[in-house]
Each structure stands twice: as structure tokens, then as C-alpha cells.
Amino acid sequence: MRRMHTGSVPTPQDTQAHFLDALYQLYLPHKDEVEGIAMAVPGFVNTRTGYLTNGGALLYNTDTPLGQLLAEKCGCCVLLENDGKAAAMAELQAGALQGCSNAAVFLIGTGVGGGIIANGQLVRGVHFTAGEYSFVNTNAAGWDDERNNMACQCSTTALLEWYRARKGLPADAPMDGRRFFEAANAGEPEALDVLERFCHAVAVQIYNLTVLLDVEKVAIGGGISKQPLLLETLRRVYDGLFASRGDSPYMKGLPRCEIVPCAFSSEANQVGALYAYLQAFHS
């Protein structure tokens, strides 16, 4: 795979028409050398038709045939993939999950994205919504409270909210992952306590995947995944879940998965969307 050109433009936040225009302006200088367009987008994406039943962070794409509209505008083949699933595809084809039969990707950010690999294939689901971890409930007794969803328990957003509360800071106090891990790496007790709680929340969901899908590996992505302390703590807490039930005869033979960092970072969506395009049009 050879990268010829790179660049970025701001994503329009107002209308789909402006979004399509921005994409067309990117396409136009290369139209004579482009066979097709592979693109990762947020939301629930029908990869076969390019129809979005939910636009995610770009709500103007909800209930629209975005793939068809872009194909008509540019006059070429278009393949749309959900951004989390594209990242999982990149890891499966050329990253941390190469050779895996069953595996998963957790992308920890504003919410929790990613994808699931089963029998060596990306799982999209009947309605193309498989792997939408943000909506997974973590507390059946608290079903009516959305704060019990993984988006509010296993995301960077949650980590920073808990840290502000632990420090007695206002909810809108400036805070980011870099500042948090500076404190945690310096051994600050409050930061380490919050990190332990956070890793327990994530580890329980990895445990659930282990039981449900018998995954070999779970690859962790997102900005904070670059922090060695996160992976170190997460692995220790995950192993501790098994150790805490070590005397149960019913746990005997239950395998543990390997927790690894994603190989790709910001380019994962592009790489994964390209592989999805090649599968759709060249396999």
C-alpha cells in the first residue's frame, strides 16, 4: 500500500450539502486518476448500499443515501464504512490483529467505538450496528440511567469526569488525557484511584467479550491507548478478575485474551476503509 497524497480539511458541521461539497473539492484535483472512493464515517452505515440510518456525530447524514449521493456527485464507485469498524478492519488486515480468528478493537475516546472479528471476518451485523459498544449497558439495575452505558463508563470522557470529581474540581474545569496521565505517572493517589476504577470498568467488558466470543486478542485504541500505564493497569486488573474467582470450579478452562495496543492511530480509518473497498470491488 503506497500513500501518494495526504491532507486534511475541516469537517462541515452544518449541512450535508456542505459536507458533500467539501468531499468533492478533495476529489476534484485527482478525478482523472481515481477509480473510487473509500471513506470511513460515524454512524450506522449499510456498507452494501451506503445508506446511513444514523449519522452519529454528523447527524445531518441520518436517514440519507450518503454513498449514492457521493457517487453521483463524483461519478465513481463509493464504499462507506463505519469509522470504528474501519479501524477494526485495519487492525485485522495489517495491524495488531493479523492472523486472529476471533478478536475485537476498543477505541476509547469521547465514547467507545471499535469492531468485532469472528471467524477471521469483520462482523457488521444484520443491521450493520455490531460493535456499537457505547450503547452497551453496564448495570442492569440502572437501565433507565444512560450513565450506565459504556460511553459513560469506559470512555476518556468518563475518565476525566471521574478525575475532576475526585479532585473536587468544577465539571467544566479544563482537563485532558495528557494532564491526567502526567498526574498518574507521577504517582498522584487520586489519579491512580480513578485509573484503577476506569480500568476495572473496561476490563469487565473485555471479560464479557472473552466469555461471549472467546476472543484471542482485544486491541485498545484511542489517544490514551498510547499511555503505557493504561495498558499495564488494564492487563493487571483484567487478570485480577480471573484471580478473584480462581477457586470456582466453573471457571476452570475459561481462557483469557491478550490485551494489546492498536498498531494504527489516526490513519486506521483510512486504511480500514480501503481494505473494505478492495473486498467489495476487487475480491
Regions found by a protein language model. Name each.
Residues G67, V78-A103:
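Conserved phosphate-binding catalytic cores of ATP/NTP-utilizing and phosphoryl-transfer enzymes
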Residues D83, G109, A273:
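Active-site glycine-centered loops adjacent to acidic/histidine catalytic or metal-binding residues
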Residues V9-P12, Y60, G125, T129-E132:
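A short acidic/small-residue loop/turn micro-motif
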Residues G50-T62:
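A charged helix-plus-loop insertion that forms the helical arch/lid used to bind
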Residues V41, R48, A118-N119:
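A cytosolic small-molecule/anion-sensing beta-strand core signal
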Residues R2-R3, L52, L122-V123:
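Hydrophobic "anchor" residues
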Residues M1-G36, N46-T49, L70-C76, Q93-C100, ...:
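ATP-binding/phosphotransfer module of carbohydrate and carboxylate kinases, centering on a glycine-rich
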Residues Q98-Q153:
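Glycine-rich phosphate-binding loop of actin/hexokinase-like ATP-binding domains
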